[in-house]
Amino acid sequence: MGRTYIVEETVGQYLSNIGLQGKAFVSGLLIGQCSSQKDYVILATRTPPKEEQSENLKHLKAKLDNLDEEWATEHACQVSRMLPGGLLVLGVFIITTLELANDFQNALRRLMFAVEKSINRKRLWNFTEEEVSERVTLHICASTKKKIFCRTYDIHDPKSSARPADWKYQSGLSSSWLSLECTVHINIHIPLSATSVSYTLEKNTKNGLTRWAKEIENGVYLINGQVKDEDCDLLEGQKKSRGNTQATSHSFDVRVLTQLLLNSDHRSTATVQICSGSVNLKGAVKCRAYIHSSKPKVKDAVQAVKRDILNTVADRCEILFEDLLLNEIPEKKDSEKEFHVLPYRVFVPLPGSTVMLCDYKFDDESAEEIRDHFMEMLDHTIKIEDLEIAEETNTACMSSSMNSQASLDNTDDEQPKQPIKTTMLLKIQQNIGVIAAFTVAVLAAGISFHYFSD
C-alpha cells in the first residue's frame, strides 16, 4: 500500500482555479510535512510563467515533455527559502488536458528528481535513515479538475519505480499545527586557509558553515526550559482545552545549548593554519518551526528547529552573495574593512493557517517589494500589514588581510556607526592570493538564548 497524503481543502480549491489559458500545461510545487504514517500538504503554488513562454504557445504542443527544469528548480529553491523548519517541498504537480496525460509522465518524474536534487544541494543537513524518502507527483485533468494519478518515487533511488498514493482532502488541516520559536546567537569564525585561495568566498563560507552545523546538530535543546526524552510526546504534560478547541495553538519556547568543553575521551589539539583572511558571522537569528499536532514527538520538534537554524543562516549568506554578485563593483584595494548588512527575516501568515512563511529583506527594500515577491513565488495574495519583521538590522564588517599569516585571533568586533554600503566580489583577488574576511551580523530579536563557544 502506498503513502497517504492528507491535503488542506484550500489546496484543492487552488488547483481547481488554475486554468491553462492557452498553455499545454501548468506545473508547480506541493508543500507540507512528512511523517512516518502520512504526509500533510498545506500549500500548492504554480511555477511563474516565463515571459517568452507566451510567445511560444503554438510550439508547446509539439514538445510536451520539455518542461523547463531549470526554471522550475530555481522557483523551487526560492520557495524552499521561504519555508520555516518542519515544512518541505513534498513534490510537484502538473495540470494538462486528459488526452495529454501519458505524454507528461516521464517529464513529471524527471522534474520531481531535479527539484529535490537542486534543493538538497544547498542544505547544511542530511535526511536521516528513518525519514520518509518518497516524494509525490500529482497529475490533474484541466477540464474535470480531478486527479488523473498520484504517485510517489523514492528520491534516494533514481531508478525507483512509481508507487500509487492516496490523495485525500481535509478541511481545517492548516490550523492543526504547533509552533516552536527560538533566537539563536551565533559567532562563527571561519579561517580562510592560504591553500584555499582558488575557492570562491561563497564556497569557503559554506565549508565553514558545514563545520558549525555539527555544533547545532549536537546541541542540547530545552523545550519550555526542560530537557525532554526525544521519544516522548511533545504535548505530554500539556493541559488540553475543553470542547472543540484543540491543543493546536501551543507555542513552545526553545533554547539551544552548545558544547562548552570536550571531555577527556575527546582530546583535541589546536591547529595552526596559514591564513589569508577569515570570515566571521556574528549576531542573532529568529527561528521558527512547525509540526503537525497529531502525536508529535520531541525528536521531531527538535529536528525541525535544528534545520530552521541551519537553513536561515545558510540562506542569508547565499542571498548576500547573490546580491553582491548582481551589484558587482570593483573592490577598494586600499580598504581593510567593508561593511555589509545581511537580510533580515520577515514572516507572513499563511491564509487560514497558524503556520507562518518567511522571506528575507534588505534595508533598502520596501514592504511592497517583499509583498510582491511573496505573491510571485507563492501565488497567494498577502497584505502589507500582515508582514512581521522579526528582527532588527545590524551591520557587518569585512576585513582584508593583505599578507598571509598564521592566525588564531578572533576578528575585530569594531563596527561603524552607520552601515557602509560597499560591495564585495565573490572571488576576491585570487591572483595575488588575497581572500577578504568579513563579519556578517545575522540579525536579532526576541526570546533569550544561551550560547557557549570554546
Swiss-Prot record:
Membrane topology annotation: Multi-pass membrane protein
Cellular compartments annotated: Membrane
Entry keyword annotation includes Transmembrane: yes
One cellular component (GO) term of this entry: membrane
Keyword terms of this UniProt record: Membrane, Transmembrane, Transmembrane helix
Keyword field contains Membrane: yes
InterPro entries listed in its UniProt record: ODR-4-like (IPR029454)
Example of a GO biological process term: protein localization
Chief localisation class: membrane
Residue spans crossing the bilayer: 82-102, 432-452
Protein family per UniProt: Belongs to the ODR-4 family.
Function statement: May play a role in the trafficking of a subset of G-protein coupled receptors.
Name under which the protein is recorded: Protein odr-4 homolog
Species lineage: Eukaryota, Metazoa, Chordata, Craniata, Vertebrata
